C-alpha cells in the first residue's frame, strides 16, 4: 500500500555538486513505502501549489524546494512537504549546508518526509559500517545507509571481524587479527584514537555494547572453552556470565539491558539462548532447524532476527518475541550472515553472496521490501547499522 508522492526538482539545485531532489527520490523509492509520480519541471518552495492539478495526477503528497548559494562552499537548502488531499503544508525547513554535507541534508529531508507520512522515523541519514577485502587488504569502512560517502576507518593485512557501533554512534568496537591473534578494540570515529578492550590469553571475540555504552559483552576463552563475559568499555573488570561445557558466543543485550541473547552449542548444535543480564535463568529460544546463530534484538525489544540453516541455505529469519515466538523468513538469498537492525526497527541489513562475491542486502521486517546495496569493493562482509545521531 504505497504512498503516491511527487518530488519536484529543487529550483537552482544544479548549483550544488549533487542534486538534492534525486537523492530524496532515491531514498523514498528504496524504502518501499512510496510510489513516485513524475513531475517534470523544478518547483521552488515559494511557488503557489495547484492542489487540484496534483490530485488529478494521483499524488497524495508533494515535495518542493530550492538550493541557494551562500558564498564560498555553503548552500541554503529549503524544502516544503504538502498534503495534496487536504491542501495544506505538513512540514518544511531550511538548512545552512556546507558543500560536503549536501547528501546528508538531502537524507535528512527524506527522513522528515518518511516520518511525517508513515509515522516512523526515517533512517536515510544514519550510517553503516562493514568490512571489505580486496586482494590481501582488509578495510573497515563507514558509509551512508545507501552505501555512498565511504570513509575508511582502518586498513589491515589481517582480518577485521565483528564491527559494532556504540549506542552514541561515535565509536565502533571490532576484532582485529593484526597481532596474529584476535583482540577486541574500540575506535573513536571522530578522532581515530583506539583502545584495547580485551587481549586475554586465547580467543577474544564477538563484542557488543550495553545499551548505555558503559560495558561490552565479549567472548573469551582465556585458554579454555569460549564463554560470554561482560567487561567495562575501558577493558577493566571482566566478569564471566555464561557457564556451559559448550562454546557460548555472539552475545547481545536486549534494548532494556535486562536480558542477553547468545549462541551456544551446549546441546550439540548451535542454538540461540537467553539469560538474565547477570547470567542467571538460561532459556533456549530457537527450536526449529539444527543451526541458529547471530541473534539481534529490535530496538523495541519485540523482534529477534537471526541466521537459520534450513532448506539448504543460511537465511535471515525474524522471530516475534511478543507473539509466541512465531517465525518469518525474511531473505530470499541463501548464504546470509551478520544481520543488523536499522535503528527504526523496520529494516535489516545483512551480508550475503551474489555469485561468489560478498555483498550487502537490506530487507524489511515484513519481508516485502528487498534491496541490494551497491558498494564498489571486492568482498563485503560483517555489516552493522549505526544508531540515530543526536
What is the predicted role of each segment?
Residues 1-54, 63, 67:
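Short beta-strand->alpha-helix linker/helix-N-cap micro-motif
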Residues 121, 132-139, 156-158, 175-184, ...:
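A flexible loop/linker signature enriched in serine peptidases of the S9 family
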Residues 128, 169-172, 213-217, 257-260, ...:
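Hydrophobic beta-strand positions that form the internal "hydrophobic ladder"
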Amino acid at each position: 500500500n504505497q504512498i503516491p508522492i511527487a518530488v519536484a526538482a529543487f529550483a537552482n539545485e544544479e548549483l550544488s555538486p549533487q542534486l538534492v531532489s534525486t537523492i530524496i527520490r532515491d531514498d523514498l523509492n528504496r524504502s518501499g513505502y512510496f510510489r513516485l509520480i513524475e513531475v517534470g519541471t523544478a518547483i521552488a518552495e515559494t511557488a503557489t501549489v495547484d492542489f487540484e492539478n496534483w490530485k488529478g495526477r494521483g499524488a497524495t503528497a508533494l515535495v518542493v524546494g530550492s538550493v541557494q548559494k551562500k558564498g564560498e562552499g555553503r548552500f541554503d537548502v529549503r524544502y516544503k512537504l504538502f498534503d495534496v488531499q487536504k491542501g495544506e503544508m505538513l512540514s518544511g525547513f531550511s538548512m545552512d549546508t556546507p558543500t560536503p554535507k549536501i547528501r546528508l541534508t538531502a537524507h535528512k529531508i527524506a527522513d522528515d518526509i518518511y516520518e511525517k507520512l508513515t509515522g516512523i522515523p526515517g533512517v536515510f541519514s544514519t550510517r553503516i559500517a562493514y568490512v571489505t577485502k580486496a586482494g590481501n587488504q582488509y578495510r573497515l569502512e563507514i558509509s551512508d545507509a545507501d552505501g555512498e560517502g565511504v570513509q575508511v576507518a582502518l586498513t589491515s593485512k589481517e582480518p577485521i571481524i565483528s564491527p559494532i557501533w556504540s549506542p552514541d554512534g561515535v565509536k565502533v568496537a571490532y576484532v582485529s587479527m593484526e597481532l596474529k591473534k584476535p583482540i577486541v578494540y574500540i575506535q573513536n570515529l571522530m578522532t581515530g584514537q583506539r583502545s584495547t578492550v580485551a587481549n586475554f590469553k586465547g580467543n577474544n571475540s564477538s563484542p557488543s555494547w550495553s545499551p548505555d555504552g558503559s560495558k561490552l559483552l565479549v567472548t573469551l576463552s582465556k585458554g579454555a572453552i569460549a564463554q560470554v563475559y561482560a567487561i567495562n568499555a575501558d577493558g577493566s573488570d571482566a566478569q564471566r556470565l555464561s557457564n556451559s561445557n559448550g562454546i557460548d558466543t555472539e552475545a547481545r543485550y536486549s534494548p532494556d539491558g535486562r536480558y542477553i541473547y547468545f549462541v551456544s552449542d551446549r546441546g550439540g548444535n548451535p542454538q540461540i539462548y537467553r539469560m538474565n543480564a547477570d547470567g542467571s535463568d538460561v532459556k533456549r529460544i530457537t527450536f526449529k532447524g539444527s543451526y541458529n546463530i547471530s541473534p539481534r534484538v529490535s530496538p523495541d525489544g519485540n523482534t529477534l532476527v537471526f541466521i537459520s540453516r534450513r532448506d539448504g541455505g543460511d537465511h535471515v529469519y525474524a522471530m516475534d518475541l511478543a507473539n509466541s515466538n512465531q517465525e518469518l523468513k525474511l531473505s530470499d538469498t541463501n548464504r546470509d550472515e551478520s544481520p543488523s537492525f536499522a535503528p527504526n526497527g523496520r529494516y535489516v541489513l545483512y551480508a550475503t553472496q551474489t555469485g561468489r562475491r560478498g555483498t550487502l542486502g537490506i530487507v524489511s521486517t515484513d519481508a516485502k521490501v528487498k534491496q541490494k546495496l551497491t558498494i564498489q569493493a571486492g568482498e563485503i562482509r560483517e555489516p552493522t547499522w549505526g544508531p540515530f545521531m543526536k
